[in-house]
């Protein structure tokens, strides 16, 4: 049965004891409202590590002034049940006051990796992500940490953070988990109307179009972006906020495509903003 830990002090006590005995720790940081994408990461950790820890913490630092922290879905009882079913050992669910007992004296700034894509639209968001992930890594001290490729910019930033701050953890990127029709699984999908849900499948279909163009030899980003945009405009009612091609993991905008690339989409429906991506090409 999965154990619920609610304080930093108790979590640190458990981790220190585990480390002394040579136990390997797998860690999945989340903000809760778990779905199959999260559970895939939990299963991967359970199959590899002696102990699997899942954090459920809605981090206020990564919410902007126009983003409703209080409205973010919280369902700790259901989350605990879900991860228990797939074998997680511990859910770490601290209070905000325990994670941030006072005003932070040191600000962590991400830099250029956060100046594009989602980071450009949400100033300070990735500073908040890096701050909380740093804290969680120091508390949990994982050997392996699992992040979804659906948030590919976040994954690239966390990998750079681990390198820059010498964290003794290996980051494992987990492929996007999709519904049977191709829609990327997301906590936000519940906010889609029935019509929007039918339209949302075209995000992944447009990425398959981009992949086909690339495989046919197209190397001009503008051609791919224009074709994807045209496809989306003819299939969805939501507002297309982004169709972009960047190098990966460097996140430099590409015009003439070389090497590994990241094609990113963002579409705003009435009550949900959906993102999706595909990473293609040689490293």
UniProtKB/Swiss-Prot annotation:
Lineage, top-rank taxon, reads Bacteria
The family database entries (HAMAP family) matched by this protein are listed as: PanC
Q: Which InterPro entries match?
A: Pantoate_ligase, Pantoate_ligase_C, Rossmann-like_a/b/a_fold
Annotated residues that bind beta-alanine are located at 62
Question: Localized where?
Answer: Cytoplasm
What SUPFAM superfamilies does the database record attribute to this sequence?
Nucleotidylyl transferase
Which EC class is this protein assigned?
A: ligase
Q: What is its main location?
A: cytoplasm
User: What residues does (R)-pantoate bind to?
Assistant: 62, 154
State what protein this is by name. Answer: Pantothenate synthetase
- Pfam families on file: Pantoate_ligase (PF02569)
Subunit info here reads: Homodimer.
The UniProt keyword set, sorted, is:
ATP-binding, Cytoplasm, Ligase, Nucleotide-binding, Pantothenate biosynthesis
Q: Cross-referenced PANTHER family, in alphabetical order?
A: CYTIDYLATE KINASE/PANTOATE-BETA-ALANINE LIGASE, PANTOATE--BETA-ALANINE LIGASE
Q: What does this protein do, in the record's words? A: Catalyzes the condensation of pantoate with beta-alanine in an ATP-dependent reaction via a pantoyl-adenylate intermediate.
What EC number is given for this enzyme?
Answer: 6.3.2.1
Protein species of origin: Staphylococcus aureus (strain Newman)
**Catalytic residues (positions):** 38
Q: What Gene Ontology terms describe what this protein does at the molecular function level?
A: ATP binding; pantoate-beta-alanine ligase activity
Q: Which residues bind ATP?
A: 31-38, 148-151, 177, 185-188
* Comment field (misc): The reaction proceeds by a bi uni uni bi ping pong mechanism.
GO annotation terms (biological process): pantothenate biosynthetic process
Give the metabolic or biological pathway.
Cofactor biosynthesis; (R)-pantothenate biosynthesis; (R)-pantothenate from (R)-pantoate and beta-alanine: step 1/1
Entry's family note:
Belongs to the pantothenate synthetase family.
Q: Which GO terms describe its cellular component?
A: cytosol
Reactions catalysed, as given in the entry: (R)-pantoate + beta-alanine + ATP = (R)-pantothenate + AMP + diphosphate + H(+)
